[in-house]
């Protein structure tokens, strides 16, 4: 299960830092967050799907690493992103 192209483009436009930004930490975290939300919904319907559960854990770890990186490099952007994505704190 992956995000369709239109959804990724929409998220990219919403979180990009400049016009041609497609891979900044902000954009990657936003895309991962959407993918995690979709997987969580899938797991509610299919609780025995262990491959999807492992994929979810992997994505959460990946997002956590990117959030730690963003926090260490630019705390203000980190706090702004956490607020915009309605993540913890």
Curated annotation (Swiss-Prot):
This is Small ribosomal subunit protein uS15. Transmembrane segments: none annotated. The keyword Thylakoid does not apply. Pfam families: Ribosomal_S15. One of the primary rRNA binding proteins, it binds directly to 16S rRNA where it helps nucleate assembly of the platform of the 30S subunit by binding and bridging several RNA helices of the 16S rRNA. GO terms for molecular function: rRNA binding; structural constituent of ribosome. GO terms for cellular component: cytosolic small ribosomal subunit. Belongs to the universal ribosomal protein uS15 family. InterPro entries: Ribosomal_uS15, Ribosomal_uS15_bac-type, uS15_NS1_RNA-bd_sf. Part of the 30S ribosomal subunit. Forms a bridge to the 50S subunit in the 70S ribosome, contacting the 23S rRNA. Keywords: Ribonucleoprotein, Ribosomal protein, RNA-binding, rRNA-binding. PROSITE patterns: RIBOSOMAL_S15. The keyword Chloroplast does not apply. One of its GO terms (biological process) is translation.
């Amino acid at each position: 299960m992956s995000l369709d192209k239109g959804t990724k483009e929409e998220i990219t436009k919403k979180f990009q830092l400049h016009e041609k930004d497609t891979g900044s930490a902000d954009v990657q975290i936003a895309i991962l967050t959407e993918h995690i939300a979709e997987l969580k919904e899938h797991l509610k319907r299919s609780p025995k799907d262990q491959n999807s559960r492992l994929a979810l854990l992997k994505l959460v770890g990946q997002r956590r690493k990117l959030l730690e990186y963003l926090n260490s490099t630019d705390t203000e952007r980190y706090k702004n992103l956490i607020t915009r994505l309605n993540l913890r704190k």
